[in-house]
Amino acid sequence: MNTFRSTIICFFLCVFSSYAQSIQDIIDAVDLDNLSLTLREFTGEITTVVDENTVTITNRQQANNELAGDYLVQKLEELDNITINDQQFDSNGRNIIATQLGKTNPNNIYIICAHYDSVADYCADDNATGTAAVLEAARILSTQCLDNTIVYALWDEEETGLNGSSFYAAQAAGNGDNILGVLNLDMMGYDGDAPGTAGDNQFDIDIRDFAGSIDMKDDIVAVLNSYTFDLSVIVVNPGTFSSDHSSFWANDYSAVLLGESWETNDQTPFYHSSGDRFSTIDLPYFHELTKLTTAYMATVGGLVNVDNGVSQTVTTLTANQASASYQWINCDTSSSISGATSQSYIPSVSGNYAVEITSGTCTELSECIVFDTLGLDDFLASEIKVFPNPVKTNLNIEITNNTESIALDLFDVSGKLVLQKSITNEVISLNMKNLPRGVYFLKVSSSEKTGTYKIVKE
Ligand SMILES: [Zn+2]
């Protein structure tokens, strides 16, 4: 979203909440443009930049996918709150594992995963789709506090025998890792039913009766039924062993495969060929499946509801979340603002500001808010009168031909807001009788104009 213009347009109270606070907000944050861009970059339809070099990732076959691995590491490194394990498991094999530690139960682990290797050029459906969906879940959920740990895993060497996931699952079992569910995404972009129409939006969940895999399917279906998705589920039991979830079944972990419907014979006709390209992907279908998988991970992850939205008036930024601790940040310099640790903050200059909100063990960052009142015109002297000055009791403000709501903010000399009022008529009085003597600044703001007046209280 473009917060720059909205700062000017929304005036008295704007709430910025592009960051998610509820499961529905998480669903709404899944961005098809972002998914499409990742797909096109990761299948070499367009160039991308990896380690400052412009590159084309056309092929991701096992012996030829270092660049693809580097791309994934770079994408994940852009995110906060995760640690990356670049896991070399044999001479050419390399899993990319990103972990977001749970705030309450860090030992409870849920995995969302996909293989990123391929058998031919492009291979958009198999499995750039699953890879892009994992990256999108990471992009959204890494901004959130979650009770449980989420592992975003991208496997290598699936196509040569599930080698990457086998290595990881065996190691996890050996360590006694408490993995409670593994959501494996493999081929989730093709929906070709009813040629010439939009398809039937059926997708498969493949399960077998290993550990809690059937319960896990029920949980996914519960999420499917709790929110609105343009999807129709086909449960496949006994499900296929032919993807990475079966590495976890082999180690007695709960796991499912989710993807397009092989069960109804509606898989891509370009399977394992270089005809499997971006142009064959049903983007709305892929979008819906990514919303579902991201919503499921947010649900089992235990989304903690810290409101990291920020409200804004012409003078003040206020964190929506009450009863927390706060640190305001200057986004332009990426630095904390000394002393700015209240729920509200009054910037002294235009700029981009964010707030870090800590509630219990949970810290979330708001987005950067553009704070810019300098774009407003000043009131002309003929349009406004502020009198008497110096003032003892009532300060009168007269605005000629006023027809809109106007904000009055009175600050003391230290910049602290001491009085706030709005007027919709032409004349108003501010009672300053009970304020200490001294110098004050009155800020008067309409949607188009602003003025600041030095007032002396006697
Ligand atoms: Zn695959």
Regions found by a protein language model. Give the residues of each.
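Short, compositionally biased serine/threonine- and acidic-rich segments at solvent-exposed termini, linkers
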Residues: 352, 359-374
